[in-house]
């Protein structure tokens, strides 16, 4: 059985084609195509611009995916699309494309929860069985565990998502959005040496990122770190090296120091709430999914915690961590095989589609 998946909940448009062999063997990725709308440095992406991008590229990506997978329309069994959560305008653009293909090709629709798509793709790629899931992206921050055919949310952000915090700070520093602001912050953080004190807000298994963002934005403004004086910053980086200075703490922090401090603080918060969830459900596995899950420092910190508990951490690379169509095809096919269908009249989008709102019929 073959499913085509369309993802477009934010600025990334993805089309994926997944094969589930009839003999029940491991599913195969036949195509995984993605195109990203990139906004100028210092700016975020607006829903209307992202939707326009998706409308302009979706047909091209579908044709390219079919060619790469070497399948015809007749081979496709179902069309899966992101029903939510996400930004309204881009979600609607992809939903319209999915409905159009359904009518043109005579194939049934399967609406997929974006978060469940991340989880199921992560489970497939890593081989993890029943992990505590840390779902971290630009729009979501949740600690999840499976129970009684639901992906239960044990903890989440109380305000903005961790990825949104990183993206907005990248705008403050006028860091490039290509290939992604969070990735560029990660690379800059590797050069940081001075840890700046920032707010740390954890409440049980929930956390908050708006306060730390406001604090670090204020620090960046007070130090004049707007990304325009790179020569001076390079000198400060040299001064902050212990090999050249004995009073590191007295040196004005650089952009790299602020990125380093932000990552260390927010990732410590994520590790804490994940460990608490592991203790609660008795799991020794952690699966990190979502765009922020690509961050190597987050994976490293989570790995230290998991190993201390006698457990392990699982994560995927950027092909599957970042929003993609293949995860929608995977989750959609799992639902399709249980008899689930989305009638055309119910193929609307839901911006606040909760992870625990999905009945996971395909798991025991």
Swiss-Prot record:
Gene: kae1
Name this polypeptide is given: tRNA N6-adenosine threonylcarbamoyltransferase
Pfam families recorded: TsaD
GO annotation (BP), single: tRNA threonylcarbamoyladenosine modification
Alphabetic keyword roster: Activator, Acyltransferase, Cytoplasm, Metal-binding, Nucleus, Transcription, Transcription regulation, Transferase, tRNA processing
Necessary cofactors: a divalent metal cation
Entries under SUPFAM superfamilies matching the protein: Actin-like ATPase domain (SSF53067)
Main localisation: cytoplasm
The UniProt record lists the keyword tRNA processing: yes
Function: Component of the EKC/KEOPS complex that is required for the formation of a threonylcarbamoyl group on adenosine at position 37 (t(6)A37) in tRNAs that read codons beginning with adenine. The complex is probably involved in the transfer of the threonylcarbamoyl moiety of threonylcarbamoyl-AMP (TC-AMP) to the N6 group of A37. Kae1 likely plays a direct catalytic role in this reaction, but requires other protein(s) of the complex to fulfill this activity. The EKC/KEOPS complex also promotes both telomere uncapping and telomere elongation.
Record family assignment: Belongs to the KAE1 / TsaD family.
Annotated localization: Cytoplasm; Nucleus
GO molecular function: chromatin DNA binding; metal ion binding; N(6)-L-threonylcarbamoyladenine synthase activity; nucleotidase activity
Domain of life the protein comes from: Eukaryota
Binding site for a divalent metal cation: 114, 118, 135, 323
């Amino acid at each position: 059985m073959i499913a085509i998946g369309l993802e477009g909940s934010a600025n990334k448009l993805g089309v994926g084609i997944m094969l589930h062999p009839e003999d029940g063997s491991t599913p195969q990725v036949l195509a995984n195509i993605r195109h990203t709308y990139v906004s100028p440095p210092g700016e975020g992406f607006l829903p209307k611009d992202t939707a326009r991008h998706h409308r302009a590229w979706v047909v091209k990506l579908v044709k390219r995916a079919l060619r790469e997978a070497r399948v015809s329309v007749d081979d496709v069994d179902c069309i899966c699309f992101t029903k939510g959560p996400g930004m309204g305008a881009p979600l609607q653009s992809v939903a319209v494309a999915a409905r159009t293909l359904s009518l043109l090709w005579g194939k049934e629709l399967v609406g997929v929860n974006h978060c469940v798509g991340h989880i199921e793709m992560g489970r497939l790629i890593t081989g993890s069985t029943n992990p505590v899931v840390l779902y971290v992206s630009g729009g979501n921050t949740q600690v999840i565990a499976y129970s009684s055919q639901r992906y239960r949310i044990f903890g989440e952000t109380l305000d903005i998502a961790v990825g949104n915090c990183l993206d907005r700070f990248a705008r403050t520093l006028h860091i490039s959005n290509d290939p992604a602001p969070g990735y560029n912050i990660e690379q800059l953080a590797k050069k940081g040496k001075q840890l700046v004190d920032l707010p740390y807000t954890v409440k049980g298994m929930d956390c908050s990122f708006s306060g730390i963002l406001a604090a670090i934005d204020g620090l960046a403004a007070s130090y004049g770190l707007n990304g325009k004086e790179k020569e001076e910053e390079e000198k400060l980086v040299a001064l902050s090296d212990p090999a050249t200075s004995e009073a590191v703490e007295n040196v004005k922090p650089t952009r790299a120091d602020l990125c380093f401090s932000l990552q260390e603080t927010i990732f410590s918060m994520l590790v804490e709430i994940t460990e608490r969830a592991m203790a609660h459900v008795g799991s020794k596995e952690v699966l990190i999914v979502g765009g922020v899950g690509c961050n190597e420092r987050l994976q490293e910190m989570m790995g230290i915690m998991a190993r201390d508990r006698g457990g392990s951490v699982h994560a995927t690379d950027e092909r599957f961590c970042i929003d993609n169509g293949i995860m929608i095809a995977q989750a959609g096919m799992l639902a399709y095989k249980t008899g689930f269908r989305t009638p055309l009249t119910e193929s609307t989008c839901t911006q606040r589609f909760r992870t625990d709102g999905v009945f996971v019929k395909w798991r025991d």
